[in-house]
Curated annotation (Swiss-Prot):
Family, as annotated: Belongs to the AccD/PCCB family.
Gene from which this protein is expressed: mmdA
Name by which UniProt lists this protein: Methylmalonyl-CoA decarboxylase subunit alpha
Alphabetic keyword roster: Cell membrane, Ion transport, Membrane, Sodium, Sodium transport, Translocase, Transport
Domain CoA carboxyltransferase N-terminal: from-to ranges: 4-260
Subunit and interaction comment: The methylmalonyl-CoA decarboxylase is composed of four subunits: the carboxyltransferase alpha subunit (MmdA), the tunnel beta subunit (MmdB), the biotin-containing gamma subunit (MmdC) and the delta subunit (MmdD).
Main subcellular location of this protein, as a coarse class: membrane
Any one GO biological process: sodium ion transport
Pfam families membership: Carboxyl_trans
One of the record's GO molecular function terms: propionyl-CoA carboxylase activity
Main EC class the enzyme belongs to: translocase
NCBIfam families per the UniProt record, alphabetical: mmdA (TIGR01117)
Length: 517
């Protein structure tokens, strides 16, 4: 055997050893817990045969507590790049079979290098998190490593899409990297994410809670709002990540990929003409509107389990990605509240950062009243929606289907906040408040002095509804561009986005704005 052949054979053996991670037994244990290994996840994420590993031979340089005698394959994290539907994507995948995926100095450097490369070439970054936390033996070096990652999460925010998947434990300082990214996916019954675990909480506060209750996938998808997507297992999670990437551009200088649209662009949906209940206080399902507007009735909902009174989702209109924000009359009548303020603002800003046009569908009676809401800061949280819409420079199209009352009407991408095109159904009611409330204020004295207060109230209510609870007052002042037949909604929205394709808008020069956080 030649010297070169021997060295090649030696290389192959080293790579085979590295590929085994923590060894067969730990791989079997990982599978037994219902989880894929770090390398299996990457192989499933990328188009077949396209993954290129980086820094497989990197090793730690810690000598504390016998670490100099420990060989940690790939430094317990696999990093590299590959193709997702033919587009370059960078990724890192923590290897729980090697010291529980604990993060040390060189582990962090590998992740940072992948992020830096993604920033240079303009490619999304996917982080597959499965780690017990910091490598305690490396002390401050491990903490510094976390800081290096957090810094890059921040400076690359809005530059390339950053996607986090929590596929196991993620505790302590480790949670802040996913929190700084654009999207967090979690797996039901497998993922946990918390700052302090159940044992620490019990010791400090006396509260008893399980890890799943404290930081499980559904907790963060429905209660805290920290995560945006929940999946049933690793494969489903990675499938969802690939689907999300299809709606996103590779970076902030590009547009999202376009897909062919076989739908008839002039199609009309007569069922929308009959959708609106005669009783303005009766609910309907806003998804019945959305599915008639988007291509193939297909959409990917963002935070479907959190603040259900507002719908946020990615979809395509005429083959092009759009971000949809819509009130859901079936939940809290579609009112805006504290949680919906956070949900809307982050979604709007994410779409704007990555050049995804916004479609807003409005049926909003107002901001949710209540002491809890006021004490919780609904003024500040509601202002986030106003800020996000106002600073967004992507094409903005608004469709008002029914109620558009008061400040909530303004907040839902009204003409005043920079909507490029505002359409309304004839059933739209654009006013300072609902007819009943307005009549009781405007005609209070007339009603009080009337011989028959009930009859007078009804008369004034009918008059106000006819004169003001409609889209025509706003249309007369140019705040609504057109009142349309509901059945033509898709056609008119396609036309609007086509017209706005070349939109260019520059905001005043500034270092950065000061969103009401």
């Amino acid at each position: 055997m030649s010297v070169a052949a021997k060295k090649i054979q030696d290389l192959q053996k080293k790579k085979e050893k590295i590929a085994l991670g923590g060894g067969i037994k730990r791989i079997e244990k990982q599978h037994a817990s219902g989880k894929m290994t770090a390398r299996e996840r990457l192989a499933y994420l990328f188009d077949e045969g396209t993954f290129v590993e980086m820094d497989a031979f990197v090793q730690h340089r810690c000598t504390n507590f016998g670490m100099d005698k420990q060989d940690l394959p790939s430094e317990s994290v696999v990093t590299g790049y590959g193709m997702v539907d033919g587009r370059v994507v960078y990724a890192f995948s923590q290897d729980f079979t090697v010291t529980g995926g604990a993060l040390g100095e060189m582990h962090a450097k590998k992740i940072c290098k992948a992020m830096d490369m993604a920033g240079k070439v303009g490619a999304p970054v996917v982080g597959l998190n499965d780690s017990g936390g910091a490598r305690i033996q490396e002390a401050v070096d491990a903490l510094s490593g976390y800081g290096d990652i957090f810094y890059r999460n921040s400076i690359y925010s809005g530059v390339v899409p950053q996607i986090s998947a929590i596929l196991g434990p993620c505790a302590g300082g480790a949670v802040y990297s996913p929190a700084l990214t654009d999207f967090i996916f979690m797996v039901d019954q497998t993922s946990q994410m918390f700052i302090t675990g159940p044992q620490v909480i019990k010791t400090v506060t006396g509260e008893e809670v399980t890890a799943e209750q404290l930081g499980g996938a559904m907790t963060h998808n429905s209660t805290s709002g920290c995560a945006q997507f929940i999946s049933q297992d690793d494969k489903a999670c990675i499938d969802d990540i690939r689907r999300l990437i299809s709606f996103l551009p590779s970076n902030n200088m590009e547009k999202a990929p376009e897909f062919g649209c076989e739908d008839d662009l002039n199609i009309q949906f007569p069922e929308l003409d009959a959708l609106m209940p005669d009783n303005p206080n009766k609910a309907y399902n806003m998804f019945d509107v959305i599915t008639k507007i988007v291509d193939n009735g297909d959409y990917m909902e963002y935070q479907p389990h959190y603040s259900k009174n507002i719908i946020t989702c990615f979809a395509r209109v005429n083959g092009k990605s759009v971000g949809i924000i819509a009130n859901q009359p079936q939940v809290m009548a579609g009112c805006l509240d504290i949680d919906s303020g956070d949900k809307c603002a982050k979604f709007i800003r994410t779409c704007d950062a990555f050049n995804i046009p916004l479609l807003t569908i409005v049926d909003v009676p107002g901001f949710l009243p209540g002491v809890t809401q006021e004490y919780g800061g609904i003024i500040r949280h509601g202002a986030k929606i106003l800020y996000a819409y106002s600073e967004a420079t992507v094409p903005k199209v608004t469709l008002i289907t029914r109620k558009a009352y008061g400040g909530a009407y303004v907040a839902m991408c009204s003409k005043s906040l920079g909507a490029d095109v505002v359409l309304a159904w004839p059933t739209a009611e654009i006013a300072v408040m609902g007819p009943a409330g307005a009549v009781n204020i405007i005609f209070r004295k007339d009603i009080k002095d009337a011989k028959d207060p009930a009859a007078t109230t009804k008369q004034k209510l009918d008059e106000y509804t006819t004169e003001f609870a409609n889209p025509y007052q706003a249309a007369r002042r140019g705040l609504v561009d057109d009142v349309i037949e509901p059945k033509t909604s898709r056609q008119r929205i396609v036309d609007a986005f086509n017209m706005l394709e070349g939109k260019r808008e520059k905001l005043p020069a500034k270092k950065h704005g000061n969103i009401p956080l």
